[in-house]
């Protein structure tokens, strides 16, 4: 691991919530998608196809509002601990752009920043691309002849006890909506399925270092296993599947897809599914469109009952976890992890956490948020 700064908690001037971004009105949709796909030669027709998903919801991605809710919760947790650390919000692809947020932080006198990237996972898209955002942000400040920021990015949190406990809680609540009171006694017609964003197989193979194996999918399987263990779900009564693949179909992505999986389960006699979007901390467009719209429509056609578990980013426990990740990165708290798969991503000033970790590969884009 590359060296990290030896800060104390009093050295942290601010926390930055760094995210993907999303449109907040019909007029934002195409400009946002153009930002997401800049330099990739994506035809306008394809952007219009994706835009339909946003326009169905008034051109609004739920992501920005949910991130603001996370920020409000972080501020409350900090206040409850007597900490007066400001929390800022910056996006890669839409307002508030992280470069603009960086300028504001500098004007406010901020120098040392703890950066929380809104992804639990390793891989290029889930981790290293946020390092690149930090590098570009400081280059922007240099071009503006402003002081650069010292940025400590927090680690991946897929196996943090508070994340696993909160995921377990929402899965249990979703099961109760189907009348299931004991997840350790699921019947043959009942299953729990955990979903995460599909990525190209080559991107999965290049997540982490070579010796880590495919880090992204290993982390997703580990997190699902930890939740299942917490709830007493037997290995035969839960699965991990993927969703929201994009591209032209010529490049293999992680499978099975949630829609194909639901059809197969129906054919095997399963009529009730508890669906837990463990790969998403908030109700991204992938969740509200792909699960609440497409999957529910399919389930209705098949006569299946689907109960979708809530995402956990809006909870007080999630905000507490973020503050604990800050404390952990400074040595104030011990490293808290329940699993054995590596949890990486803690880095300084955009340098990768390890040499040759999560190297980028050319891949189709996902334009949703």
From Swiss-Prot:
Pfam families: Ferrochelatase. GO terms for biological process: heme biosynthetic process. Its main location: cytoplasm. Pathway: Porphyrin-containing compound metabolism; protoheme biosynthesis. Fe(2+) binds at residues 197, 286. Fe-coproporphyrin III binds at residues 61, 130. It is found in: Cytoplasm. It is an enzyme of class 4 (lyase). This is Coproporphyrin III ferrochelatase. It comes from Corynebacterium diphtheriae (strain ATCC 700971 / NCTC 13129 / Biotype gravis). The gene is cpfC. One of its GO terms (molecular function) is ferrochelatase activity. It catalyses: Fe-coproporphyrin III + 2 H(+) = coproporphyrin III + Fe(2+). Involved in coproporphyrin-dependent heme b biosynthesis. Catalyzes the insertion of ferrous iron into coproporphyrin III to form Fe-coproporphyrin III.
